[in-house]
């Protein structure tokens, strides 16, 4: 267990994950980063992405996370995210509708807030990528 650390993933509505892991890979605006046990203290943000981690039993796991705040301290990592969903929790039809709606809003951006449409498009795209990658 010396090469593991505690990962907590929380959203406003629930605790999504709380267990020991070997490593976590996330994406920030500056690129991908990986966290291992005994990482230095850090506060960072992420962009919507497919977060990857290896649990203490060696199983590879993936989940969608929306924009997040990440805090690492004393071998504990807390990801506070607007949304976090494992593949089985993603409603594919809803994600498809959100993707099409955002795509339409980007095409007609003079009628919509382009930044919000881009964010919605990217979130839906990441959810669908995770859902379809595990088929």
From Swiss-Prot:
Protein purpose: Produces ATP from ADP in the presence of a proton gradient across the membrane.
Gene field: atpC
Subunit note: F-type ATPases have 2 components, CF(1) - the catalytic core - and CF(0) - the membrane proton channel. CF(1) has five subunits: alpha(3), beta(3), gamma(1), delta(1), epsilon(1). CF(0) has three main subunits: a, b and c.
Family: Belongs to the ATPase epsilon chain family.
Name of the protein this chain belongs to: ATP synthase epsilon chain
Pfam families attached to this UniProt entry: ATP-synt_DE, ATP-synt_DE_N
Signal peptide coordinates: none
Keywords: ATP synthesis, Cell membrane, CF(1), Hydrogen ion transport, Ion transport, Membrane, Transport
Disulphide bond pairs: none
Gene Ontology MF annotations: ATP binding; proton-transporting ATP synthase activity, rotational mechanism
Cellular localisation: Cell membrane
Membrane disposition: Peripheral membrane protein
Matches recorded under NCBIfam families: ATP_synt_epsi
Gene3D superfamilies: ATP synthase delta/epsilon subunit, C-terminal domain, F0F1 ATP synthase delta/epsilon subunit, N-terminal
GO cellular component: plasma membrane; proton-transporting ATP synthase complex
